[in-house]
């Protein structure tokens, strides 16, 4: 346990941020998984809708600093390429 008051506060803040980031990343993985399942099943309309919502979640996570903006861009690009192959 730390002795410095400001470090104790940083520890609490970091723990809250870690839990928030964990939740956001989990929902991102779920969204990407749902998109890939729709593509695998050949449901192009459903996959297109899921691509829009997944892209939005990726952008939001990047703007909040949960993931890097380039990582979000790369994931969106890869998902769009997957959809266009259908």
From Swiss-Prot:
A Pfam family: Ribosomal_S20p
What pairs make up the disulfide bonds? none
Molecular function (GO) terms for this protein are: small ribosomal subunit rRNA binding; structural constituent of ribosome
Keyword Ribonucleoprotein included in the entry's annotation? yes
Its Gene Ontology cellular component terms are: cytosol; small ribosomal subunit
Q: Which UniProt keywords apply?
A: Ribonucleoprotein, Ribosomal protein, RNA-binding, rRNA-binding
Q: Which domain of life is it from?
A: Bacteria
**Any one GO biological process:** translation
Residues covered by region (Disordered): 1-25
Say what the protein does.
Binds directly to 16S ribosomal RNA.
NCBIfam families under this entry? S20 (TIGR00029)
> Which HAMAP family does the protein's record reference?
Ribosomal_bS20
Q: What family does the entry list?
A: Belongs to the bacterial ribosomal protein bS20 family.
User: What is the protein name stated in its UniProt record?
Assistant: Small ribosomal subunit protein bS20
What organism does the record attribute this protein to? Mycobacterium leprae (strain TN)
Originating gene: rpsT
